[in-house]
Structure formats: C-alpha cells, structure tokens
Amino acid sequence: MKSSKVPHGRYSRLGALASLAGRVASNVAWEGAKQFAQGNRPSRKDLVMSPANIAHVADKLADLRGAAMKVGQLLSMDAGDLIPPELSDLLARLRNHATPMPSTQLNQVLTEQWGPEWKQDFTHFRFSPIASASIGQVHEAYTDAGDKVAVKVQYPRIKDSIDSDVDNVITLLRLSGLIPKDANYQALLDEAKQQLHDEADYRKEAKAMMRFNERLNAHTDLVVPNIHSTLTTDRVLTMDFMAGEPIETLTKAEPAVRHRAVSQLFTLLFEEVFVFGEVQTDPNFANYLYQPESGRIVLLDFGATRQYTSRFTEGYRKLFLAAIEKDNPGIDAALTQIGFFAEAILPEQKASVLELVNTACEPIATDAPFNFGQADLATRLRNRGMALSMEQGYWHTPPADALFLHRKIAGLYLLAAKLDVTLNVRALLMPYLTAERVKTA
C-alpha cells in the first residue's frame, strides 16, 4: 500500500482543496467543450458528476485524512437522500480506506507520545499499518511483556485542522456543484466537528472502551479488547490484539450463522439505547470482527460513543411502541418529544415524515421475521427522503442525538441486507420497551 505524508499546515490543506476545486472546474470546462463539439448539450450536473471528478474528490479526501475525509464519510452515510448515488457510493469507500503515513512520520508521532526510547517497550513493532482510516492508522506489535497488541496512532496535528477542514470541504462541495447549494447541512457539520474532536481524544475513547468492556464482560457472544493504559495517550491508543474476519465475509456463511451475528448486534443496540444510555454510533462495518471458532463478535472503535438522556430514550420507546401499534398520532407525539419537527413544518410535510418513519420501522411492524435481503429498505428510504427534501422543500435536520442514532440503525439495516438475513426484530426489541428496562439515570 502506498503511503503519503499527512499534510497538516492550514495553508497546505487549504491549498490541496483549492487545487481540487480547480481540477474539477477544468474537467467541467474540458468535458463540456468536447460534448458541445460532438453536438451534445450536457447539463452542468452531468459534467460535474463525471466519474473523473468524483474519483478526484474521493482520492483527495483520502490523502488529506482527518476532518476532510470524515465529511465525506458522514455525507455518504447521513446525506444519502440529498446527494447523488454516484457521489455517495464513491464517498462510501472512504469509510474503510485512507492513505497511510510513511514510517518516518509515524516514528516522529510515537517519539512525541512515548519518548525517544519507545522501542524498548516492544519486542516487535510492525511499521506497516494493518488498517488506515480518517483519524489514524492501526499497527500490530508485541510488548516486552509478551502481549500482542493493536496500536492506533493518530495522524499528526489532525486535531488542529478539524474546524477549518470541515468548513473548507463543504464549501468545496457546494461550489463544485457536488451537493445542493441550498441544502442546510449546518447541524450535520457542527456535529461532524464535535465528533471529530471527541474521536481525536484517545484517552476518552479508552475510557468508553473500558466501560463497554465491563458491561459486556459476562457476554458470551460479544467482546471488547482490553486497554493497555500505560501505552495509551491522547494520540496513541493501545489495546489487546484480537483476531477476526471482516463481518462482511459472513455472506458466505450458513444462514444460521448470519442470523445469529445480526441478532447479537440488534440486541446490543437495544441494550445500548435502553439500558446503558450510551451508544457506539459509528455504523462502519470495519468496527466488527467475527471469530469463526467461537462465534463471537469483536467490537472496535469507540470514538463515536454518545450518551443519551432518559427523556431521549423514553421518546424512542414511545416511538417504537406507536410504530408497532400503527398509531400515527403517537408517532407524532414521540417525534415531537425527540425534537424531530421544525416549527414551520407544513401538514403535508409532516405526513411525509410520518410515512418515512413508518417505512423505517417496517422491521418491527409485524411480529414475524423480516426479510432484509428482499426488502429494498435502504433504496425506499432514500427515495422518500429525496422526495421530502427536494420536492417538498423540507430541509430540517433532526437533533444530533437522533441523527447519530439513526446512522447506527441504518448501518445495521445495511448489514442485515448485505448478509441476506431474515430476522424477527420485534421479538428482540419488545423486552426493552417495558418501562422497567428503560434507563432511568
């Protein structure tokens, strides 16, 4: 895998984005001239959305890493109803890929965090990363005590570039025409900034992992790696190395194995919302590893954990119960409690939102197995969301807490569809909808 130094100066990062904007513009002009010469009359959208332009955007965000890359990730997951499918699909590849930093830059970061003699704490340290993402990359190592560990190392000075990167990238995407100019992404962008600041605090993530490790300690099907506190800093996170296969590889497994894995993850979600009051909201499939020998799922990456109030979880308890009862006034009341509706919403817009919510709740609408593989749920939700925003002009963004919870739920829907699972989700959910199971803290 090729590596490249992470640009960390404000002007070098802004310059990279500016050059990308120029490249997109020149491609539009060149392709437009070529099409006109051939007698065609292409729309500006078609010129902007050319495969070459989209590929340039995705590649540049992967090189920049950090907030620039995270905006692409968030748009591909959260704004699928607003941006074209071609851009969403290409941005989606950013969820699992970033260009790693070279060994010299890696060594500099580790020396800053652990001191110049850091290698004495290890009998082996693999400098080539086993994974790379938006905030950092992961390395395999053996400590001098003989423990095999995974070391997550944050890219240099990424934290300093978060706010400006988010603003610069969204400006770039707007000016280039890759996203609608009149779409209101401000709430999403503010949350992207806050989430990135949280994810850049590895001590905070370590504490979240330790909480989940303790909560799931007696669980036979789910496991969270132990943290090595003495080798963890604000920018380096060290944990037990846990082997496993990407959960997507279960597409080749027996139906019972796929069913069990997805059941475990839905049950965990309901436990997080209604018992823990804290949810790991990142839906990235790479956060799950499957261990075939034991059937356990390893849970990774807790940088995007969010804590929820009892009022919020009570709102979702009411929402799910109303959806099960097909009680639209109850759904309306629950969504209002959650803070879902804008004050200026029109009656026809509210009706469309209720229809959208009922579609999203189809897996719990009946007390029977739901066929995720055949339901085409993601496409129908995208189409309804697109109609609501583009045709009816309803741009209101739900509260951040709801937005990130919806990402997690949507991620499980996508995983269940990918693994072609048929599952009675209502049966898993119902025990958590009784008042005594809801978080009271």
Where are the regions a protein language model picked out?
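Broad phosphate/nucleotide-binding scaffolds in NTP-utilizing and phosphate-metabolizing enzymes
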Residues: 1-270, 277, 290-298, 302-310, ...
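Catalytic-loop of the protein kinase fold
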Residues: 275-285
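Short amphipathic alpha-helical recognition elements used for nucleic-acid or partner binding
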Residues: 315-318
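Short helix-adjacent coil turns
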Residues: 326-327
